[in-house]
A protein has these predicted regions:
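A structural motif
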Residues: 19-302
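N-terminal signal peptide
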Residues: 10-21
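Classical eukaryotic N-terminal signal peptides for Sec-dependent ER targeting/secretion
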Residues: 1-6
Length: 302
């Protein structure tokens, strides 16, 4: 009950914020957690949060360990019941003196102070942790201690409400029409889900695919402002670190894809539950076998 209430209390205005945190326990993680870092040996690390000392603290989970780890009171503490972050976001460099706009809250102190999701390199690892804006300090769970840091990356929202038919400033095109017109990643509520699709500013149209059709959307859209790498896949494959763009009617995640079709590079979705990928094109929901999936970019380890 505590964790369910927390989702409602801390969720942002994003279309899919209620899906961002999923319950977990020692020995098992949700099916599609969002990778946020790694151990020195390359093992991925994920963002965790748990009720702790009358607050909700943010930490890390290593899938090879039993439980998650929370930094609090100078100590790295293990917890057996927790939630794992399964949403999206962009990592922005920051310091303890300046929190960037759109920072994602993930927890709170006992006095209600919000805690924000951060990560930082430490002894060859990239470790998720928390930032307290009152103390102006970041904290990581590492080596049995609560490690204090002053320089880190903050997770910020990478979906923003779309006003009109122009992409937000500074957003790069992710695809193109056969005539070369750029296409941008958007998403919109459809049925009981939220579906990724495409925006064509040249003709002022926004489309998602749903129920066998290409559906033109005129309201309620969000634009993707993040970035990543495109990884080739086919036949229902989902590469590690795939970025979720929404969810289907049954709650299954939908990943952001693009595929070559009719001379263009079109944007769409991939549903791992059905093993199928689709793009909206020519009034139809077109199934594609070969596609590229947008995944998080971690850069070099060090």
């Amino acid at each position: 009950m505590i964790l369910i209430a927390l989702v409602l209390m801390l969720s942002s205005a994003s279309l899919v914020s209620a899906q961002d945190w999923q319950p977990a326990a020692a020995g098992g993680l949700p099916q599609w957690p969002t990778p946020a870092g790694y151990e020195a040996d390359g093992t991925p690390l994920y963002i965790a949060r748990a009720p702790f000392n009358r607050g909700v603290q943010i930490g890390k989970v290593n899938p090879t360990h039993a439980g998650a780890y929370i930094p609090w009171g100078g100590v790295e503490s293990s917890v057996s019941a927790f939630e794992v972050y399964c949403g999206s976001g962009a990592w922005v460099p920051a310091t303890a003196a300046a929190l960037p706009p759109g920072a994602v809250p993930g927890g709170k102190e006992a006095d209600g102070t919000p805690l924000y999701i951060i990560r930082a390199p430490l002894e060859g690892s990239l470790v998720p942790g928390k930032f307290n804006p009152v103390f102006h300090k970041g904290y990581l769970p590492y080596g049995g201690k609560e490690q204090e840091i002053q320089s880190f990356e903050v997770l910020v929202q990478d979906w923003v409400p779309l006003a009109g038919v122009q992409p937000p400033p500074g957003v790069a095109a992710a695809g193109f029409e056969a005539n070369g017109a750029p296409l941008y990643i958007v998403r919109a509520p459809m049925g009981n889900g939220v579906h990724p699709g495409k925006l064509n500013p040249a003709n002022g149209r926004e489309y998602v695919s749903y129920g066998g059709r290409e559906v033109e959307m005129t309201s309620g859209l969000e634009a993707f402002t993040g970035s990543g790498d495109w990884v080739a896949a086919a036949d229902g494959e989902v590469p590690f670190g795939a970025i979720k763009g929404g969810y289907d009617d049954d709650g299954s995640p939908l990943f952001i894809i693009r595929a070559r079709y009719q001379g263009g590079m079109h944007l769409g979705k991939m549903n791992p539950a059905s093993g199928k990928a689709y793009i909206p094109y020519g009034g139809q929901e077109v199934e594609v076998v070969a596609y590229e999936v947008l995944v998080y970019h971690f850069g070099a380890r060090g």
